[in-house]
Amino acid sequence: ELNADQETKYFTLIEKRGQRIPLQHLTGVQEFMGFPFLVNEHVLIPRQDTEILVEEALSVLKKEKGTVTLLDMCTGSGCILLSILKLTQRECGCDFIYGTGADLSEQALEVAGKNAAILGTEAVFCRSDLFERIDGRFSMIVSNPPYIRTGEIGTLQEEVRAHDPLMALDGGADGLDFYRRIIRESTEHLLPKGYLMLEIGYDQAQAVGEWMREAGFQRISVKKDLAGLDRVVSGVYDG
């Protein structure tokens, strides 16, 4: 039985959910890869589809030896980076993995830092407009950048268009603005035989794969999600 305060809180939450405020914003938590992640209005709520990107990264890291350096571009809540770091501790063959998460949003980086502390995972977080303030080269770069076409944002579910941060959704007129930059600039930040892995929209694999090919990436592959839609494009840079 609820006391008066609990009852008031309960009906307040019901009212807010009726206003299409995401459940994750009401609870402040979303599970991803089996881990709890803090979320708020400053970060994209982690989606199950994005777990495909983490699984693809882990499938490569299982075969790596020595020290691995990992960059998560557009890190948001840090769910991709921190899940990979956490799971490599028990699943992968590398001796040690250093993780860096980059995002333009200071508020998002605050959330990512809190999530790292909760999970007991060490990572460096950097405020950067893509690679602008990123130094050094990495064994792997992963990213789930904004990829919704500007003109389509108004058609999204209210929970998404009104409550996920616009800067985490808007990929420009064709949804591909961030891929152009990430692919072009990543070649200056990958070690030889380094991997680039990108989450994509269902109809973006051809364009993204072709740009990676033109930039010098090889062994380009496309991974589908559970719905059978193209979800992750990856490639190896031999530069």
What are the residue ranges of the model-derived segments?
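C-terminal beta-strand of the catalytic ATP-binding
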Residues: 145-147, 236-239
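Class I S-adenosylmethionine-dependent transferase superfamily signal
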Residues: 57, 84, 160, 182-186
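Conserved AdoMet
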Residues: 1-60
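Conserved beta-strand segments of alpha/beta enzyme cores
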Residues: 36, 98, 122-124, 218-221
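Conserved Class I SAM-dependent methyltransferase catalytic core
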Residues: 173-237
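Conserved SAM/SAH cofactor-binding pocket of Class I
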Residues: 52-155
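Mobile active-site "lid"/loop adjacent to the S-adenosyl-L-methionine
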Residues: 147-177
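Short loop/edge segments at beta-strand edges and connector loops
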Residues: 27, 126-128, 200, 224
